[in-house]
Design a protein with these regions (language model features):
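Short, well-ordered secondary-structure micro-motifs
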Residues: 26-27, 71, 94, 148
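Active-site cofactor/cluster-binding pocket
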Residues: 37-99
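Charged/polar interaction segments and conserved charged motifs
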Residues: 25-28, 64, 131-133
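Anionic-ligand anchoring segments at beta-strand to alpha-helix junctions in alpha/beta enzyme folds, i.e.
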Residues: 1-54
Length: 167
């Protein structure tokens, strides 16, 4: 989400990943090997802590519990926090969020983000790699479109395919 929006707004963006693990490594490698993206696109929590400034906006995706974010300290340091998630909220929530969009009926956070991108406007351009990542996120969370799917899921997938997803 933040990559294509930030690019349109000419803002610097970083993805904070403390440990990419084996499931995310192919995507991390795709971004690292793509000249369209800065070398410091994907950073760890400590690097993010060192970079945080007064105007930083922290976008937390696919989680709404502070204790399971990749870097809980960022939640204390950032004044502007946006949360996008499809998991039901429990008693532990990110309380200081400027905006919290939690939709438990969505199949995935990638579905929610895809829906939002459709309504932002024509000037937002999603790169193929970003569409691939979001499409893959939908596939993973729906077990290849077998569970938790609905019309919105397939509309989001179709939007991503129209915008370059080729998974």
């Amino acid at each position: 989400l933040p990559i294509c929006i930030a690019a349109t707004l000419e803002k610097k963006v970083h993805i904070v990943l403390s440990d990419s693990g084996t499931s995310l490594q192919p995507f991390v490698d795709m971004f690292h090997n793509n000249p369209d993206y800065d070398d410091d696109l994907i950073i760890n929590g400590q690097q993010a802590i060192e970079m945080v400034g007064n105007n930083a906006v922290l976008v937390v995706v696919d989680v709404n519990k502070p204790s399971i974010t990749d870097c809980p300290e960022l939640l204390r340091l950032c004044k502007s926090i946006v949360v996008f998630d499809h998991h039901r909220q429990g008693t532990e929530v990110i309380e200081n969020a400027t905006l919290s969009y939690v939709e438990a009926y969505a199949s995935s956070t990638c579905e929610m983000v895809s829906e939002m991108l459709q309504y932002i406007g024509e000037n937002i351009k999603i790169k193929n790699i970003e569409a691939d990542c979001m499409y893959s996120g939908i596939m993973i969370d729906t077990n290849n479109f077998m569970t938790k799917t609905g019309v919105r899921t397939f509309e989001a997938a179709a939007f991503l395919r129209r915008n370059g997803a080729d998974v």
